[in-house]
Amino acid sequence: MITAYLAAATAAQALLPAGKGDPTWFDNPALTQKFGPAILETLMMTGLSTIFAVIIGTLLGLVLVQTGKGGLTPNKGVYQAVSFVVNIVRSLPFIIGIIMLIPLTKLLVGKSTGSLATVVPLVILSAPFFARLVETNLLAVDPGKIEAAQMMGASNRQIRWGVLIREAMPALIQSITTLAITLIGYSAMAGAVGGGGLGQMAINYGYNRWQDDVMISTVVAIIVIVQIIQLIGDILSRLVDHRAR
């Protein structure tokens, strides 16, 4: 199955022999016809992956904080089990992980290549990374505020969402920004194995056909996307930071 997947992922590359004298820039069909869709594919992969990774990672992070030492409901067994799984998944290199998850990807979306299929491994491999960021952010919340909420009779659910998440929101937004930027890089790497988007375009045309204009354009596009994401993240983080008011 893995051999078939890699063969499919490199099929486009085999059909793109390096051609001397290819049209460049605005005369290059790769840029005029495929550049825009490739950007949209990258944004789609990153957007969907970020949303699902944030949901799953936040829940895992809350479990780690609540069951850890000094948490609302300490449970060493649960904490160690969740922490072990998180560490195992985090240790997997993305390219290896995306190949290992081929059966699950095909089961969920019906195919193992393309931008939509890439979302599955992106979410699974990045959610544990975000879970650790959430854990770090929540552990940084002043314990005095948690104790004050407990003294006022707040439930664990109210403390989780009304104290921990609320107080850590600026840091959480910065962590979401970091996650989204990381996923941009992951989605580009996925292009090497048929993942679609700017990464696959850079491989197929920029590398295999030695079209420097395509390579430069994809790199610039990724840089611009990253800068915009970082800018939005910084603005949102400042807006929700009640300490800066």
Identify what each model region corresponds to.
Residues 63-69, 216-245:
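C-terminal transmembrane helix and the adjacent membrane-cytosol boundary/short C-terminal tail
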Residues 156-187:
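Transmembrane alpha-helices
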Residues 37-45, 90, 94-129, 214-218:
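Loop-to-helix entry region at the N-terminal start of transmembrane alpha-helices
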Residues 104, 175-225, 231-234:
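Non-cytoplasmic
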Residues 138-168, 208:
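Short helix-to-coil transition segments within interhelical loops
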Residues 63-101, 122, 133-136:
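Cytoplasmic-entry segments and transmembrane alpha-helices of multi-pass inner-membrane transporters
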Residues 35-66:
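Transmembrane alpha-helix signature in integral membrane proteins
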Residues 1-37:
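Short, strongly hydrophobic alpha-helical membrane anchors
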